[in-house]
Amino acid sequence: VDTIMKDKSFGEAGEQLVIEEFLEGQEVSVLAFSDGNTVLLMDSAQDHKAALDGDKGPNTGGMGAYSPAPIFTDILRQKVRDTIMLPLVRAMKSEGRPYKGILYAGLMLTKNGPKTLEFNARFGDPETQPLLVRMESDIVPLFEACIDGTLDQHELQWKTEPSVCVVMAAEGYPGSYEKGKEISGLDEARALPDVVVFHAGTKTK
């Protein structure tokens, strides 16, 4: 507090502090389709943000994720749908701003139940990668249903096998790191069964 308010480490932005409850538990990412009325939840996923193994090092945008998340039971799933996702969509509709598209909720599963950390109007990264490789449903009709308001006519089908996404980042990430280094071994990785290579922040020459 002294660093922020007395030493002015954040300038004028540090003149006011908001103190909130520290939530303990496991984080889980819940993604859903919405057509403004209906909410269709995707399967669960958990990402890991710490840069190093053992949940150590600085936080990142995500060093990996897996789906499904064993901690996210069917009972929890129904509770999240009924008490968090649906009320949000209904409230936006009542305000004349119906939400159509992807909803991404970051939740903390506490001893007192799921608590909302954040909402995003987008897919989660890297949670989406293991989710989409497990999804058997065609995603295009789902997007169309979000637009047309016919999401209640759809169900999602999933592969039973779990999926894991591992992020390969440059040394030094999320701090300063060298750019332009060649990435090798991708052809060999693609040749492995059940392996998909996704790109982010890369280019080909």
Give, region by region, the residue ranges found by the protein language model:
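A residue-level signal for beta-strand positions that form part of recognition/binding surfaces
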Residues: 16, 41, 163-165, 194
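Active-site "cap" helix and flanking loop/linker of ATP-utilizing ligase/carboxylase catalytic domains
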Residues: 81-103, 120-192, 199-204
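Internal nucleotide-binding/catalytic subdomain
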Residues: 1-130
